[in-house]
């Protein structure tokens, strides 16, 4: 068995691997003291994510602390928006704010095609530096927001509890929304290609708010554009594994499996055994420990990891949380998660 490629990359490709790889969504962030200390010195999120030295440093913090099998770019799904002509800010404890929400045909027609090399070269620089730093000790992950979720932010203008504004557009002006979604699909595919060319070995698409759609509306406003992104990327980078994550995905799990991605990331509301049974065998799975469990005891964390990995046995599986790690999570418990993840196959074997 060759170890010339990182474990997580080999697992994501469906190769036989020596153990289950593990990483964590939002593994670089507020639960880590080193991140909070840096945030105190650089309070602007956009500066932290768009200054290549800061983004690189933050991306490496969890790798230096826990040695996960994946190192993900520290960035945000909204980072490409200014390159399309949409300005935004991220306010601490409030989330993203879009200065001028996109709600008219003239605004959509004014959007620019994304040219990542020109408008966000810092992303390419950070990905290249991460590859140089981690070598084959970890896979470098890139990520994007899917078209529906990006549209939800730019139409609503901020995070939302009921998504009334974009749903009003969907049901009153569907042609307008489809134009916006198509623009995002083309630009996001361009952005993913840029990330891969810059050093990302595995990429994840977050359609965080697609779980707010009924299955029928998911088929209309989310899935076709997820698939469009996947098709465009696979046409030029067929060997790069692609992961799809949706928060609250239980109602659309089978539909996710038809988008062309390689791996479905399950949230914690789906039992791992049920998720595996509902998805075609050729698809890998990622997840899916409840991030809230990391406030519990080490014993409870270990037990839940063993349960998830045991239920995913026989499948291509990447251990992860079912959502991003929560602020305030004890760092020692994050350490338990990673250490258990690296030894869980032995734990299952000894208990068998």
UniProtKB/Swiss-Prot annotation:
Subcellular location: Cytoplasm
Disulfide bonds: none
Biochemical pathway: Porphyrin-containing compound metabolism; protoporphyrin-IX biosynthesis; coproporphyrinogen-III from 5-aminolevulinate: step 4/4
Site annotation Transition state stabilizer: residues: 76
One Gene Ontology term from the biological process aspect of the record: protoporphyrinogen IX biosynthetic process
Pfam families (UniProt xref): URO-D (PF01208)
The protein's name in its UniProt record: Uroporphyrinogen decarboxylase
């Amino acid at each position: 068995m060759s170890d010339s490629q990182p474990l997580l990359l080999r697992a994501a490709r469906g190769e036989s691997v020596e153990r289950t790889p593990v990483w964590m969504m939002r593994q670089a962030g507020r639960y880590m003291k080193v991140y909070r200390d840096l945030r105190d010195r650089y309070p602007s999120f956009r500066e932290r994510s768009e200054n290549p030295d800061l983004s690189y440093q933050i991306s490496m913090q969890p790798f230096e602390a826990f040695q996960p099998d994946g190192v993900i770019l520290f960035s945000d799904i909204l980072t490409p928006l200014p390159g399309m002509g949409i300005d935004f800010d991220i306010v601490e404890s409030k989330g993203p704010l879009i200065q001028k929400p996109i709600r008219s045909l003239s605004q959509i027609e004014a959007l620019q095609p994304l040219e990542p090399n020109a408008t966000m070269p810092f992303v390419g620089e950070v990905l290249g530096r991460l590859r140089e730093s981690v070598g084959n000790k970890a896979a470098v992950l890139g990520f994007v927001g899917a078209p529906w979720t990006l549209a939800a932010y730019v139409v609503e203008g901020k995070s939302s509890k009921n998504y009334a504004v974009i749903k009003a557009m969907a049901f009153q002006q569907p042609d307008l929304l489809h134009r916006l979604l198509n623009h995002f699909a083309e630009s996001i595919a361009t952005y993913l290609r840029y990330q891969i060319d810059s050093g990302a070995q595995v990429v994840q698409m977050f359609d965080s708010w697609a779980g707010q759609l009924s299955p029928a509306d998911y088929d209309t406003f989310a899935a076709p554009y997820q698939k469009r992104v996947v098709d465009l990327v696979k046409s030029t980078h067929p060997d790069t594994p692609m992961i799809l994550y949706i928060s609250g995905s239980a109602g659309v799990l089978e539909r996710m499996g038809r988008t062309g991605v390689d791996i479905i990331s399950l949230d914690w509301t789906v039992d791992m055994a049920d998720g595996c049974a509902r998805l075609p065998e050729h698809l890998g799975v990622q997840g899916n420990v409840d991030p809230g469990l990391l406030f519990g005891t080490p014993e409870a964390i270990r037990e839940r990891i063993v349960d998830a990995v045991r239920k995913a046995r026989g499948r291509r599986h990447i251990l992860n949380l079912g959502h991003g790690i929560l602020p305030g999570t004890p760092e020692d418990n994050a350490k338990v998660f990673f250490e258990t993840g690296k030894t869980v196959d032995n734990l299952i074997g000894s208990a068998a």
